[in-house]
Amino acid sequence: MDMEEKPKYGEPRKFDPSFKGPIQNRGCTDIVCCIIFIIAILGYLAVGILAWTHGDPRKVIYPTDSMGQFCGQGKLEKQPFLFYFNMMKCASPMVLLEFQCPTPQVCVQTCPNRTMTLITAISKPQDWEYYKSYCKEDPGHKAAAQILKEKLCPAYLVSSNPFLQRCFPSMGKKGEVITVGDQEKFSDGVNVLDAKDLMAGMKNASIVMEGRQVAMKIFEDYTKSWYWILICLLIAVVLSLIFIVLLRFLAGVMVWVMILMVVAVIAYGIAHCSIKYVSLKDTPGSNITLQQLGFQPDFAVYLHIRQTWLAFIIILAILELIIILLLIFLRNRIRVAVELMKEASRAIGYVMSSLVFPIFTFFLLAIVIAFWGVNAVFLSTSSEPVYKVFNETECVHSRETCNPENFTSSSMKSDCPHSQCLFAFYGGETPYHKYLILLQFYNVFLFFWCANFVTALGQMTLAGAFASYYWAFDKSKDMPAFPLCASLGRSLRYHTGSLAFGSLLLAIVQVIRVLLEYIDHKLKGAENKFAKFLLCCLKCCFWCLEKFIKFINRNAYIMVAIYGKNFCRSARDAFFLLMRNVVRVVVLDKVTDFILFLGKLLIVGLVGIFAFFFFSGQTDAFKGTAPSLHYYWVPILTVLVCSYLIAHGFFSVYAMCVDTLFLCFLEDLERNDGSAERPYLMSENLLNVLKKKNQAN
């Protein structure tokens, strides 16, 4: 007799009269992974202590002179500005590679406001006293030739202005002629130079600082607009709460209202962009392409180009078309999903504390992000000053490491008489500095692991609470008094290892994706098409793998919360259960996710429209109230991103509730048959949706 073939996706759940929801008598799961996670956390704290001991964030904030000292700090507190002896030396291409001009640099109290040479200043006592404040050290009574040979003082001073704590020549124009300090020409003590000779050096030095200038303007915009940003985010919170409450009582109506309002908001966006596109038709310069315009630090320039608004119209139109087509083809399934959301609304009504639980998760995530950020800053600034040989002409020792204290008597100086030993960058040769890159990698990896762990803890806690609701035959009597707290306690006490296991798998894939993005960035200029194709395939595969692991983890945590089994068994059971009901997974679960996404989109759209009209100053009602900003898109983008995160936090409760109830009623269908002995535990509405019914006793 042939042996009976086992089902491909396991046996359906059997009826168990003793099963009353999340099992109370359970043991610890995945203990080995729990121990590894605790050790990793202790190591993470050790890395933090090590970084805080060696790091110095001032290295990325303050300019550094040729000796590696911070301008405006310590004994140089009254000398906040960095002065370059010869700005024209900054025209070297090495400036863009090493971020260091091959000329002496000193910290000064103020930037020079006069133009003079060493030769003329040394003969006038009053001018000489002023001139010496821009020397590396007091030259005493040395002759001008000796001072220049030892590079104690600059050959000339040029009237300058401070920019990002650095002194740059005050460039101007008289007609078409470039001037410096209102002069077309100046002397360096030997030759008469044109003011334009300084431009190349200034250009390279300013390129290094241009990114910081944009960052400083953005920071300044935040200081002016943070109060209004918080108000916009408060509006997002209020809107999210209103939608959650309305979903509690008017789930069916609210779902269709959300859908129609999202369509309306996108339609308004298309109309607004079209009006802008047409209004710029006769504006001079508006017809140039984005490619011709190139990158501009002032992003408001792009809003005066017709092609920008055309791109917005196309993107919004495609999004609108996709949503409308999905609504047409999924209209029947949306009705089913509405009933599932109504059941989720009732579950949340019994576990009202779940609505504020995202705040707890957000708080833990904020701690993880802050710890990672502080560690990253301190690790990146824990190097020691490294000095290199700089020379204007070819030198055998060029870019070699040197010691400024004995450089003048070293063989390097004798081989290259015109060379200088200048501060180049921060590095180090100690064991700590040699393994610094590994510590930075560990910091990134633990960040992903801990962030995923916090997210997993939130998911398992909510799953346990909502499972308690579903499997309670009498909701008012059989549910625990504090289902959320009870579920959180079970998750931490018994399943820290399972949470760590699932989040570890996800962290590994995410770190690999980060490395692939880094490699892709490095190979952007490469011509090897096969390497690019292979890298693109790897990125696509790992993106899909990350999505799959997130899906499996989410359902595995639900099964762990209910049955208390280890991660692997729970993941297998959840996967098999879903595969045995694969059609229902698509019909109910994913359509519900789409509806919740539309809710997030609606909240972001409403808050984003308000933020746009407020910060752009295009509405008369806000002109006297809105702050004056360099880039008004900075607070708008911030509001959009944070509004989405806020909406996601509140709607994630609904999403987790739906996923949990979905798995529970799939098991309910397998365990029970609607008879008096084995009645379904789902609500009457769900029974009607699934065309099932309980028999009367």
Curated annotation (Swiss-Prot):
* Subcellular localization(s) per the UniProt record: Cell membrane; Mitochondrion outer membrane
Q: Is Magnesium found in the keyword set?
A: no
| Range of residues in the leader sequence | none
The record describes the protein's role as: Choline/H+ antiporter, mainly in mitochodria. Also acts as a low-affinity ethanolamine/H+ antiporter, regulating the supply of extracellular ethanolamine (Etn) for the CDP-Etn pathway, redistribute intracellular Etn and balance the CDP-Cho and CDP-Etn arms of the Kennedy pathway.
Q: Name one GO biological process term.
A: transmembrane transport
**Reactions performed catalytically:** choline(out) + n H(+)(in) = choline(in) + n H(+)(out); ethanolamine(out) + n H(+)(in) = ethanolamine(in) + n H(+)(out)
Pull the Cytoplasmic topological domain ranges from the record: 1-30, 248-249, 331-353, 457-498, 615-632
Q: How does it sit in the membrane?
A: Multi-pass membrane protein
Chain ranges on the Extracellular side, renumbered to this chain: 52-226, 271-309, 375-435, 520-593, 654-697
CC per GO annotation: membrane; mitochondrial outer membrane; plasma membrane
Protein name in UniProt: Choline transporter-like protein 2
Q: Which GO terms describe its molecular function?
A: antiporter activity; choline transmembrane transporter activity; ethanolamine transmembrane transporter activity; transmembrane transporter activity
InterPro entries reported in the protein's UniProt record: Choline_transptr-like
Q: Which UniProt keywords apply?
A: Antiport, Cell membrane, Glycoprotein, Membrane, Mitochondrion, Mitochondrion outer membrane, Phosphoprotein, Transmembrane, Transmembrane helix, Transport
Membership in a protein family: Belongs to the CTL (choline transporter-like) family.
Q: Which residues are glycosylated?
A: 113, 204, 287, 391, 406
Q: Where are the transmembrane segments?
A: 31-51, 227-247, 250-270, 310-330, 354-374, 436-456, 499-519, 594-614, 633-653
